[in-house]
Each structure stands twice: as structure tokens, then as C-alpha cells.
Amino acid sequence: PFPPYPLPNPAGFYELQLKGAGTTPYSRFADGRAVLRSSVREFVASEAMHSLGVPTTRALSLALTGDRSVVRDQFYDGRARLEPGAVVCRVSPCFVRFGSFELPAAREDPALARKLLDFVVEKHYPHLAAASFAPSNRSPGLPLLLEVAERTGRTVAAWQACGFVHGVLNTVRRTGFSVRFSIFF
């Protein structure tokens, strides 16, 4: 079927990410917390995708926070209630997403965008760095875009092959493999 991307990682390192650990600079206006219900869904979905050979992040662990103080409106019908808190530890070779490049673009900061691009290429796509020195291609931006677009296409094809439908396809959920399973069908 499909290669078990992103694990194992040929670069030899992995990134960890905590879902539900609390407020961070990236929490936007939310509280940065997660409930058990969505955390179990995240864990099960990522492991199911992996078992089906679909490119995905993996869930390394799932833990309860020990409190019932996370307020969520499960059906968005105005009836929020307290739910048990949880934390999922995700593992992946890379958590940079399409949306990661939106911040420097919104700030109109090309230097920051270039710094992020150089970091991503150096750490996650080193084979593109050598190709970028050709006179006709001074930036690895286009080769990176093409490779990630191809990887994303293969991932979406793998979803379709197993009948998976991701419920939210925004830029913070696009990486070239499956990530963030908070809503799916």
C-alpha cells in the first residue's frame, strides 16, 4: 500500500507536540486545553491511519490531566459543559504546516519567511538545499512547494482509498501527511 511516512524518519530525529497542554503563543484565542473525548479520537484516528499505511503523525501517549474543568460545547448548540481534560503527545519528523508560513506573510516579513524556509529545508528537506544552488533556481521555495504538494496529494489519495474524510481542511492541518484529527468522518 502506502509507505509508513512519517515514521521511520530518514533524518533520524523526531519532534514532539503536546495537544491540550495549555495556553501557548499559538493558542490563538482558545484556552489551549483538550478534552478526553477529542484526545481519544486523535489517538485512535492517528493509529488507525498508521495501521492502514496512510501517511500520518503518531500518538505517543494519552494522559488525563486529573481535572474536569475544561468547558466545551460538543455540538455547538449553546450547551457547553465541563469535561475531563487530557493531553496527547504527538510524534512526527516535522510539525511545520502550510499555515506556518502564513504568520510571516501576514506580518509582511519576508526575512522571517525566508528564515523559516531555510530552517525547513535544512532540517527536513536537506536534499533540496543542494538543488537550490542551480543558477535557474536560487531559492528552495519552489522545489519545497512542489514536493509538499505531491506528498499532500498522495496523502489525500490514501485517505480516499480507505474511505477517510477529514472534516476540516485548513492550513494548520496540512503538512503533507495526516495531522490533527479533531474532526473527521
What is each stretch, according to the model?
Residues V148-C162:
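Phosphate/ATP-binding catalytic cores across multiple sugar-kinase/actin-like superfamilies
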Residues P1-R138, L142, R154-A157, G176:
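Conserved ATP-binding subdomain of kinase catalytic cores across diverse folds
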Residues D77-G78, L82, A161-H166, N170-F185:
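Catalytic activation segment of kinase domains across protein kinase-like and atypical kinase folds
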